[in-house]
Amino acid sequence: MKAFKGFSPELTSLLGDHKEETSRFVPGATMYAKESKTARTGYHCCENPFECLAYYAWDGKNRFWEVEARGDIDEDSQERISCTEIRLVKELTPFEFAYEGMLYMLNHPQRGNWQQAFKGCTVAKDEAEAREADDIAIARGENPKVKGGYNSILGLIKEKDGEILDAKIIRIVVPKMAGRWMTINENREVIMLEEEAD
């Protein structure tokens, strides 16, 4: 099962039993646990990558990986996963992390808990804003709008009555786009919105 996991800069898990053999990870290697029970035993990960931010801050130091969860898998109502086998598949860039989070919402539009508010990452109804480089802001709604600073990552998900109609993710690399509200049209083209006068 495809899932996501956060780590310290040294690829260690900050939660769990803190033993070297169960807390330090190696890319490509499979780790094994005897049993899995969410919030108790096994290796933990999340199906929604943004849920990892509840445990590891979006600070430019922590690392986020796509993982493969296998073996005995236990899930809880908070979308956490515990498994007896886990393998690090790919380290995600900030853009890939945001993309995977949007993809999760597109694949599971009816699931709750999609709104997120962490330092550096906001996923919100109707409008969201990112301030710094590599910060993430994703807006979801009938007429979503986003705004971000230079080199921030912005996502737009248009929906109506719970059905996803369109989506787009961009990185702000054109200076004139920084700090301006934007949305997408029916052709998924980015449209700058007029700023309201003070």
Annotate each predicted stretch with a short phrase:
Residues 1-198:
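Short, glycine-biased loop/turn motifs at secondary-structure junctions and
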